[in-house]
Amino acid sequence: MFYLVTMCIPEKYSKECVKMMEESASKGFPISCIAGRDRYDCIERVGRKEADIVAVDPEDMYLAAKNKLAEKAGYNIIEQVRTKEEPDAIYRYEAVAVIHKDLDINNVQGLKGLKSCHTGVGRNVGYKIPITKLTAMGVLTDINNPEYSARENELRALSTLFDKGCLVGTWSPDPAINQRLKETYNNMCALCEKPNVCDYPDIYSGYEGALRCLAHNGGDVAWTKVIYVKRFFGLPVGVTPAVPTSENPADFRYFCPDGSKVPIDTDTKPCTWAARPWQGYMTNGADANNAEAIQRELTQLGQLGENEKANWWEDLLLLNEKTLAVAAPPVSPEEHLQSAKYMDVIERNSGAPERDARWCVWDKNALNKCRSLARAAFSRDARPRFDCILEKDETACLKAVRDNGADITVIDGGSVKRAINEYNAKPIVAETYGQGSTKFSERPALAVIKSGSSINGLGDFKNKLSCHSGYVGDFAGYYAPAFTLKLNSLIKEPSEIDTFFSKSCAPGAPLDSKSCQLCVGINTGDDQTKEATKCKPTNAEYYNGGKGALRCLKDGKGDVAFLPLTALQQLDNEKDAAGKLEDYVLVCPNGGQAPINEWERCNLGLEPPRIIVSSAGKSPNALEELKHGILAASTLYSKNPDLLHLFGAWGDKPNVLFKDDVKELISIDSTWDKWNSWADIQRDYGSH
């Protein structure tokens, strides 16, 4: 039976999706695909039966199992991504504790005072699993002390339980906090190759490194996974035969959660603490016939991708040369996780009372995004858990933070001075935009023309064609040129910018206005799609954003482009189709042209970033915990936007929660002193 399978894929892989459809169709088993915003959105779409299948990690399965992402969704895992080395293994890997055979220990309480070797902080078998299981057994104690952040409570507990250890990695995404934690709990770095660094690369870190630490650096117990134990001791692994090694497995034992010891050999089953389930393909309520047809086509698709060495094979199917898709009896995501004893590892927290970071917003779209972030980040171990609160406006949120009805809110940089003075706010985290922004994350707004243009001052813009990075709400594309033209008496009111130019493309403007006439909509597709996406303030509009405004200028649609410096400094000639840096010069507000690198004397104003504020009444530890949770989520999703599109347009809405061009979030320290000048910018430019 043939069944046309529709796969949902994150938008970032749209091109691979088209390629996959073409290649599968040419082989006689066409697979269709639709683009979701990210994997989270795809899980919702499969739940609503807009698509049949989505490729997922165990953490995504948790989202499907635990959050009502779609009414009446009957999610099932119908294929698993397994390794060719162990195609019959039930789990991707199993977590074990390994000890010296003659270690005097007969229960988990005996771990007290031992020297412990870990893969690395925040990792599964070397950190999350032992912490989760040892806490449940009452071995790790005082792990929910309200004086400390969730991460510090874990590190304190490990540091107290073990005499020494090696636990490398980034203990906090904030460098100052990272340093303090490593100094405070330095016994957990003592067994590392470089105790004073306690970070990768380190020969005693990772799965094999933990065993090396046990065998050769004085460790008593190593937390690692079965496959690496087998490799370390030269035992056969799946289809790979035994190999000679200088390590002797007879000198070591698996240490079991019940306190017993098990030999490390080819005949004895290891005792495990938990397992990480395989990744897989998740469908929604596929009946037996459909499930079989889908499995058959996915297996064919995996083979085709491998033969073609296609990009889509890796990005869309989560496969590589070491893995393959294996059909498995359909199982609910919850069962898939529980059979591996992995559910509590994902849900790991430091016990009651649970502390949520309550995030205040005043817009329905921001609430939707905040809730998605809260669910997704929790499944991927960002702590504290976020909770989202809707108030009527910025002032109400600042009051809520002041009065302990909320913990954090995101405000414009220009509002921080008022927030500090009137609501006892404390700025803790800022947006950052990468190359082309200042030390304090400001983005210079520029008027850009082509090299060789005869335009020599603001007055020359009258009745010209203009390209804007955005409309109302956009600093470089709207507020900065409007303010500058008004300051120079070329317009009386900012709204007159719409008629000052003869035609423009300012995505987000009313569709029937002059400000949309130069916009073109999506770059591919039919006229109907182009029309539907024209002048939208999202990447569907080819001329949207800073790089879009440059494309509009390069294509000869406009005479001038208003955009932030970041768009120029981050120009990728191949990818952006927006020309080269040397193709452009600046027009200065005081007249004349200037090269791009003289932007400091030739800009239309500096745009402040958005800032996350909390309450100055909170303890340093409470503020540190909030920073940790926010930065952990930012680090994760700035690197993996396919999991959750935290930075960029949210649906068809721009600048929801954060500005679209954010690269990641950074910690604010005492050197930040821009609040007064930013308040002046907000007042003068009307950019609020």
What are the language-model segments listed below?
Residues 1-51, 56-59, 81-92, 103, ...:
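N-terminal hydrophobic or amphipathic helices and topogenic motifs
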Residues 63-86, 232-270, 418-436, 570-601:
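Ligand-binding "clamshell"
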Residues 47-56, 69-71, 115, 216-224, ...:
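Alpha-to-beta junction loops
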Residues 60-63, 102-105, 121-125, 227-231, ...:
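Solvent-exposed loop/turn segments at secondary-structure junctions
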Residues 41-43, 209-213, 396-400, 548-552:
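Short, hydrophobic alpha-helical packing/hinge segments within bilobed ligand-binding/sensory domains
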Residues 77-158, 431-506:
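A conserved helix-loop-strand patch within extracytoplasmic ligand-binding domains
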Residues 203-204, 208-220, 229, 260-265, ...:
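Extended serine/threonine-enriched, polar tracts that run as long, contiguous segments within proteins
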